[in-house]
């Protein structure tokens, strides 16, 4: 039995989304800019998706923009803010545990003279709001904080941070990378004082190559992709109609039972942790109180993550040794370093990430496998 537990890297495409996308590829394949029936038929799918996401996020459809994925959404939010507000200030704040799609554009701006401050986190991966308050300045134009950490699953205090930012720095924008939370944890950006929010299709059983950027009507950022002026000039390029429609379909499926799914996965995760708790020298990373149940980070002492990963692969169990987006460029995890994982354990951490399709039977099987292979792998390591 194949057991896929790398859902934070990507998810299996929804069958309903695939069916809809196939219809669009073969029948409604027109260009949305074309002034004929084929163009209008294609445009209907974009309008329907905008309406759907506006309903999900409780915002206006004019605040929804489609991108090529989470990385583009994050880059647009950060670089677009810098381009539009650069004359007012050159200061941004982010955290020490962001995904590379946020940390890399921040590093890019820093190399061009911007002042970037990084919030530290505690041993569970949570930021300190008092530190955030102390870093806010008159020339701060953007704060970017992820909702759910992609490596350890810690959930940041987004609502409290957003309220603080808008009270202390009313002209500053608040960006949230919600790529690991969207479709799993309900979130209302306007209620949480979020100006910019990024989401990705393939993390919730939609197709790859499609993302979303919510831009609050109060926020004004510059486009970073120029051309034909599509999407009200915010993101040029012919819309990926099949991708957007598939994203919307998949989102509707997961949001239909989002709270029930959350509770079920939380129970499965807790039960799994309990069942492996008798294995010595295993540490659960992240926050016991503030976490996404869809992500479980485990440090297994004296077992190299890559060796562990391939041992599980031999059993047709698929997990991750870190963020898949950076796995082709192996380096020490900035998140694990930030939460003070001991140096000897940095290379002994794996991530199991669940989906709404994950079953009790699958996790019971994984528990049994861990009980058998970890002692065996340690025999070789400890010789």
Place the predicted regions along the sequence by residue.
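Pyridoxal 5′-phosphate
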Residues: 1-383
């Amino acid at each position: 039995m194949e057991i896929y537990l790398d859902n934070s890297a990507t998810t299996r495409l929804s069958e309903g989304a695939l069916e809809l996308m196939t219809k669009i590829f073969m029948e409604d394949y027109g260009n949305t800019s074309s002034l004929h029936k084929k163009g209008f038929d294609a445009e209907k799918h974009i309008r329907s998706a905008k309406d759907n996401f506006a309903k999900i996020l409780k915002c206006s459809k004019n605040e929804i923009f489609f991108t090529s994925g989470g990385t583009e959404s994050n880059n647009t939010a950060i670089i677009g803010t810098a381009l539009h507000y650069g004359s007012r200030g050159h200061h941004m704040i982010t955290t020490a545990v962001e995904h590379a799609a946020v940390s890399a554009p921040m590093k890019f701006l820093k190399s061009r003279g911007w002042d970037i401050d990084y919030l530290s986190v505690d041993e569970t991966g949570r930021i300190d709001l008092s530190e955030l308050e102390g870093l806010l300045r008159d020339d701060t134009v953007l704060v970017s904080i992820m909702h759910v950490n992609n490596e350890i699953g810690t959930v940041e205090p987004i609502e409290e941070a957003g309220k603080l930012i808008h009270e202390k720095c009313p002209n500053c924008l608040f960006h949230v990378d919600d790529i690991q939370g969207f479709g799993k944890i309900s979130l209302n950006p306007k209620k949480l004082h979020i100006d910019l929010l990024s989401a990705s299709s393939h993390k919730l059983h939609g197709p790859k190559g499609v993302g979303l950027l919510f831009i609050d009507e109060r926020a004004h950022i510059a486009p970073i992709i120029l051309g034909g002026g599509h999407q009200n000039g915010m993101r040029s390029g012919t819309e990926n109609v099949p991708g957007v429609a598939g994203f919307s379909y998949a989102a509707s499926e997961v949001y239909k039972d989002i709270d029930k799914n959350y509770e079920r996965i939380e129970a499965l995760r807790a039960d799994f942790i309990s069942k492996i708790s008798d294995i010595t020298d295993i540490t659960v990373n992240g926050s016991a109180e503030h976490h996404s149940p869809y992500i479980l980070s485990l440090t297994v002492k004296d077992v190299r993550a890559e060796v562990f990963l391939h041992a599980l692969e031999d059993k047709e169990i698929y997990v991750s040794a870190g963020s898949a987006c950076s796995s082709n460029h192996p380096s020490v995890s900035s998140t694990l370093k930030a939460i003070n994982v001991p140096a000897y354990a940095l290379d002994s951490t794996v991530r199991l990430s669940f989906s709404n399709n994950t079953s009790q039977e699958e996790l019971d099987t994984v528990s049994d496998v861990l009980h058998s292979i970890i002692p065996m792998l340690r025999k070789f390591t400890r010789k």
